[in-house]
Amino acid sequence: LPREFMARENDNIVASDEHNSRGIELADRGWLDEAIKEFKKAIDLDPDSAHAHDNLATVYAEKKLFREALGEYLTALKLEPESPTAHYNLACFLSTHAGEMAVAEYREAIELDPEYPDAHLNLGLTYADQGRIEDAMRELQTAIELDPQDAFPRHELAALLMDEGDYRSAITQLKEVVRLDAENFEAHLDLGICYAQKGFYAEAERSYEKAKALNAEDLLLNYNLAALYALWGRRADALAFLQKAVTVDRQKVQGWLATDTMFDSLKGDPEFDALF
C-alpha cells in the first residue's frame, strides 16, 4: 500500500480511539446519547474497531435498545472471533437481557397483529418466568380467547392458578383441557390434585384413575393417590400407593413427606414407618 494511504489509515485509527475514549467518559457520566454519537464517529473512522462496536452495544443495552445492541455485539464478534472478551460480552448481554428482549419482541408482534395467539401465549410464559403472574395470566387468557381449541394455554393458566392457590378457577380450565385432549396425563393429574385440595375426593379419584390408565407407574401420580387416600381415611389404599411411590424414588418421597401434612393421619402407624 502507498505510504500516505497507510499514514491516513493510522490517523483514522488514532482519531477513532480518541472518539472511543470520549464515548467511554460520557457513558460513565450517564450521558448515553452523547456517548452513542462518539462511538458512531469512532466506527465511521475505523469500521473494524471491535471495541467501539462493543462499547456502542453496551450503551444501547443500557438504553434498552436490545435489537441494536445485539447487532453491535455480533459485529464485534465477527471482527474478532478469537476474542474471549467478545464472546463473554455477548453471553453477558444474553443472560441479562434475553427475557426483556423477548418481551419487547412479543409485544411488537402483538402490536402488529393483536390477534396472534402464539405471541400472547409465549409472552404469558415469559412473564410467568419473570414472576409477573398477573401479566402472565392476562396474556394466557387472551391466547385462550383467540384460540379456544388449543389446550396448551389453558393448562399453563391452570398451573399458574394452582400456584396461586386458586384451585376452583384451575378446575374450570383443566376440565376444558381434558375435554380437548383426553390423553393428557399431566392435566388429569393436575385436575385430581385440584379436586383433592378442594375436598372433592371422589372427583379426585376419578381424575387420578384416568391418569393411571395413561401412566400407572408415575411417581407423582402414586404419591398423590396415597395423599388422597390418607386424607380420605382409606389407610390400606394410602399405604399401597405410597409403597409404589417409594419403590420408584425413596429419597424424593421422604423429602416430600417431611413437610406434607396430608399424611399426618398415617404418621406413627407401624406399617407407614416400616416403608422407610
Task: Please annotate each region the language model reported.
Residues 2-18:
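TPR-adjacent "capping" and linker segments in tetratricopeptide-repeat scaffold/adaptor proteins
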Residues 14, 48, 82, 115, ...:
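Short coil loop/turn residues that delineate tetratricopeptide repeat
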Residues 17-28, 51-62, 85-95, 118-129, ...:
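Conserved alpha-helical positions within TPR/SEL1-like repeat arrays
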Residues 28-41, 62-75, 94-108, 128-142, ...:
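Structural signature of tandem alpha-helical TPR/SEL1-like repeats
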Residues 165-168, 172, 179, 183-276:
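Alpha-helical protein-protein interaction modules
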